[in-house]
Amino acid sequence: MSYQLYRNTTLGNTLQESLDELIQYGQITPGLAFKVLLQFDKSINNALNQRVKARVTFKAGKLNTYRFCDNVWTLMLNDVEFREVHEIVKVDKVKIVACDGKSGEF
C-alpha cells in the first residue's frame, strides 16, 4: 500500500470531493471510489519519484520537535530558508513528513 500523504494536497482534496459527489448522485460505488484513491496514491508517488528533478536545499534556525514512528519522520522547523538555484524563500514554520522511499510501497 502506498503512502496517502498527497491526499491532503489541492489535487487530492479535489479528487476526493469529486468522488464524494459521484457517490452522492449514485454514479459510482464507494468501493470504486476507494480503488480510485488507492490508484491516485500509487500514481502520485510514482510520478514524484520519476519525474521531479528539481533540487532544493534548506537551512533551519531551529529544530522545534521531531518524531519517528512507523518508518515516518516528522520534523517541525522554525525560521527556515529554502534555496533553489536563483531563488531564496524564508518562512517562519515548516512541517516536514518524510517516508522511507525504499520500503517497496511505491
UniProtKB/Swiss-Prot annotation:
Signal peptide: none
Tissues where the protein occurs: Ubiquitous.
SUPFAM superfamilies recorded: Transcription factor IIA (TFIIA), alpha-helical domain, Transcription factor IIA (TFIIA), beta-barrel domain
Gene3D superfamilies named in the record: Transcription factor IIA (TFIIA), beta-barrel domain (2.30.18.10), Transcription factor IIA gamma subunit, alpha-helical domain (1.10.287.190)
UniProt cross-references to InterPro entries, sorted A to Z: TFIIA_a-hlx, TFIIA_b-brl, TFIIA_gsu, TFIIA_gsu_C, TFIIA_gsu_N
Gene Ontology molecular function: TBP-class protein binding
CDD domains given in the database record: TFIIA_gamma_C (cd10014), TFIIA_gamma_N (cd10145)
Pfam families assigned to the protein according to its UniProt record, in alphabetical order: TFIIA_gamma_C, TFIIA_gamma_N
Gene Ontology biological process terms, A to Z: RNA polymerase II preinitiation complex assembly; transcription by RNA polymerase II; transcription initiation at RNA polymerase II promoter
Localization: Nucleus
Disruption phenotype: Females are sterile.
Keywords attached to this entry: Nucleus, Transcription, Transcription regulation
Gene Ontology CC annotations of this record: heterochromatin; nucleus; transcription factor TFIIA complex
Family under the similarity heading: Belongs to the TFIIA subunit 2 family.
Function: TFIIA is a component of the transcription machinery of RNA polymerase II and plays an important role in transcriptional activation. TFIIA in a complex with TBP mediates transcriptional activity. Part of a rhi-dependent transcription machinery that enables the generation of piRNA precursors from heterochromatin while maintaining the suppression of transposon-encoded promoters and enhancers.
Record text on subunit structure and interactions: TFIIA is a heterodimer of the large unprocessed subunit 1 and a small subunit gamma. It was originally believed to be a heterotrimer of an alpha (p30), a beta (p20) and a gamma (p14) subunit. Forms a complex with Moonshiner/CG12721 and Trf2.
Protein name: Transcription initiation factor IIA subunit 2
Species annotation: Drosophila melanogaster
